[in-house]
Structure formats: structure tokens, C-alpha cells
Amino acid sequence: EIFHSLNSQGKPLTQSDLLRSFVFMRAEKGSEDRDKLYERYWKYFEEDFWDRLVRRGNQWSSHLDVITRVFLSSKKGFPVDSKKVHLEYKNWIIQDKPYNNVNDELSAFNQYGRRYRYFQS
């Protein structure tokens, strides 16, 4: 339970932290190369841009938290509550099985993130 609430610095985990953990745990279970997936798709989201805070309504969120919510909302076809992104994403992946593997999932997320960043420039 603590693992799902605090990071290594003792700060609360964000929705994108929880999502990343969920994705890479599934990659390992599926015998996919986590390091290769990280280098190919997730390392891009470690750049400073993704940690910058942006205001959405009366709430401040990192670009990474925003894109995880927008990505999921676009895939599900309706807005997802910013506090429930991890749970909704997990349910979507388990129930709908929209991707054959984590590689395909991260590829789609990475492409979506690159388009988002392009339009933020």
C-alpha cells in the first residue's frame, strides 16, 4: 500500500507515476525487455518539459499527468477524472485489452505525447 502512495523521496506518487509502474510491471510479466521499452519509449517522458506544471481550470498538473489523462480520455471516448487516471487506465487495459503487448501500448502513448508536445511549443 505504501508503494502505491509514496515515491523514493517520500513524495506522493502522481497518476503518471502509478501508470508507469503498472505498465512496466506488465512488461516484465509478459517477458518484454523493460530496459529496451524504457529507452525506446519512456525515456522521452523523463525530459524536464514533462515535469513542468500547467494550469487546467483551477488545478495545476505536470505535462505528463495531463497527457496521460488526455490520452486515456481520447481512447475511452469520454473525460477521465484527473484523480482516477491510474485506476481507469488499469481497468481499460485489463477489460478492453486494446494492445497486443506493452511495446504497442508504449509506442502509441509515445506518439501521442510527441504530438501533444509539438502543439505546446
Briefly describe each language-model feature range.
Residues 1-121:
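Polyanionic (Asp/Glu-rich) segments that form extended negatively charged tracts
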